[in-house]
Amino acid sequence: MPTIIKTTCDPVEEKLRTFVEGLLGGKVTAMQRLLRWRPAWNLELQRDGQTLKLHIRGERGGDVSPFPDLRREAEILTLLGQQGVPVPHIYGFCEDPQAIVMELVPGDRDVSTAQSDTERHAVARQWVDAMARMHQLPLQPFIAQGIHLPTSAEDITLAGLQAYYPLYARNKTKPQPLAEFALGWLRRNVPQHRTRPAFVQYDSGQFLFENGQVLGLYDFEFAMIGDPLADLASARMRDNYEPLGDRFADLYRYYQHVTGEPADPDVVRYHTALFATVSTMQFSASVATPQPGDPHDTYTEFDIALRRVVVHALAEAMGIALQTPKLDMVSSGPNAQLLTMLADALAQVEVVSDFQKTKLRAVSKLLEYLGRGDAMELHLRELEQQEAQVLLDRTFSDYSEIDAELEAFVKSAGPEYDEPLLRLFMAQIERRVLVYGSTAIGASASHIDLPPVT
């Protein structure tokens, strides 16, 4: 007999309904939680004979955000809307639970739903227009809101790093040699001519369109004042899994046309490496030391994909060719029978709500990932130990020593070690993608292919 998991009325949703009705009047007649890892809902409110469609954005949860105050994002969206940037209208902010109540912007992000290539290209250019408009906004309203204004070229370029680093340092529980290597390279190679700060989304390329029209930009959780080319770089990364609608190089040229800014492709490449690095730092502790309640499948997916982007972006910036190492694969490990039993037991669990089904799928994805680890993880560690011993010219008695020694080495090594260190990290991540890339969690990492800048 299948196991039935009963669900009850969610007290969080009751609080949100009560708040919305008190804020706007009327009656909430429909409320749907979105099937994603972050709490979010779409609502319909009946008021004065009309239907008002709303979206509620809840707290991310955990300690993975450089700007954890959700109210900050609500205030940013309000400022942007007041200055003509297409963003959702903000109706209010709920304190318990913390959540933004905003307009539900219609449309889709998936550009494959456009009617033609012509429409896709037009939509992509409308997004560039909106981003460029944002980059020209006066900064004083944002400064008055408490957003830091960087002034020197180094501060402007490294604004994202400075925002994310305290989060990384506070939560760091284990050595992170790749992140420390990337940080060292980025700090040594700051472009010194980027002296104009702008308001940036810092996780760009997120927009909704309908009938060939961009109706809104969304997700300003990480927005700050920094180098406008950081937005081009983060959108370039996003193009891997959420296509922008046209070739990135063409959109970058269009951005230059709209803004009058000269081409600076090396800086876009630099910011690609920087954004990938701070994004990896953001989730590194959540994967190294998992916390109860975290979306473990999502954070593991982010971790392996972002680490691969760090390596690819650094290789591009350094002019080093990518290499895929050879690896003898094994299909199953010593715990294969037990994992098969666990998968079967999981398949016998039935849940009622669609949301709980997503939770069950998350467990299934972790189990699939674990199966590949059971088959290959020890071999991966053996290879990593051999390579680290050669580079560091010492013998390790235990695999657990490697990351600590590598981190200490990258912090003291000079630029002459950049290439051998990058090649070591490249071999590590490429082998892991060979092992885990066929899983649902590893699929994103297997599709990493940064589009050309020019």
Language model segments and positions:
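An alpha-helical support segment within catalytic cores of ATP-dependent transferases
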Residues: 12-26, 139-203, 211
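C-terminal amphipathic alpha-helical interaction region
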Residues: 333-365, 370-454
